[in-house]
From Swiss-Prot:
Keyword Endoplasmic reticulum: no
Record SMART domains: YqgFc (SM00732)
Protein name stated in the entry: Putative pre-16S rRNA nuclease
Database matches in Pfam families: RuvX
GO biological process, one term: rRNA 5'-end processing
Biological role: Could be a nuclease involved in processing of the 5'-end of pre-16S rRNA.
Top-level taxonomy: Bacteria, Pseudomonadati, Pseudomonadota, Alphaproteobacteria, Rickettsiales
CDD domains xrefs: YqgF
Annotated source species: Rickettsia canadensis (strain McKiel)
Major site of localization recorded for this protein: cytoplasm
Top EC class, one word: hydrolase
Length: 154
């Protein structure tokens, strides 16, 4: 189920369980995961987009393997706040995922996270090819970190 309010999303989470975040792209998805205490977010992996079914199955496999209790999906909104074609694609992905899991799904504004992730990796001297292979998972961890920081208030 897609939850629009962060406090409601938090209320639906099972204590001491992990969350995942997804940075959805047309070619690959970055996946990040929290620890059980939800104090840190870590890049987990990158999934290559083959087709919609394969992507959904990969995400569901991660959910089952790590006993995930909630999903955060980065929502790409234009810098001016305008909904874009990619915004609609991500919303459709979230709706599709919601058909296969009862977990709460929260859409988090992800403006500039992939660029920030790429700059972060670059600052550590990571080569361009390696940055491009890992920036989506790092971006997902930044998206998740934003949510983790926000839910600490509740």
């Amino acid at each position: 189920m897609i939850i629009k309010n962060l406090q409601e999303f938090y209320r639906l989470l099972i204590p001491n369980t992990q969350l995942i975040a997804i940075d959805y792209g047309s070619k690959k998805l970055g996946i990040a995961m929290s620890n059980g205490e939800r104090s840190i977010a870590m890049p987990l992996n990158t999934i290559t987009v083959v087709n919609k079914t394969a992507v959904i199955n990969s995400v569901l496999s991660i959910i089952a393997k790590y006993k995930i209790c909630g999903v955060v999906i980065g929502l790409p909104i234009d810098m001016s706040g305008v909904v874009t074609q990619q915004t609609n694609i991500v919303m459709k992905f979230a709706e599709e995922l919601a058909k296969y899991t009862n977990l709460p799904i929260y859409l988090q504004d992800e403006r500039l996270t992939t660029k920030a992730a790429n700059n972060f990796l670059k600052s550590f001297g990571v080569k361009r090819k390696d940055r491009n292979n890992n920036d989506d998972a790092v971006a997902a961890s930044m998206i998740l970190e934003t949510v983790l920081d926000s839910i600490k208030r509740y």
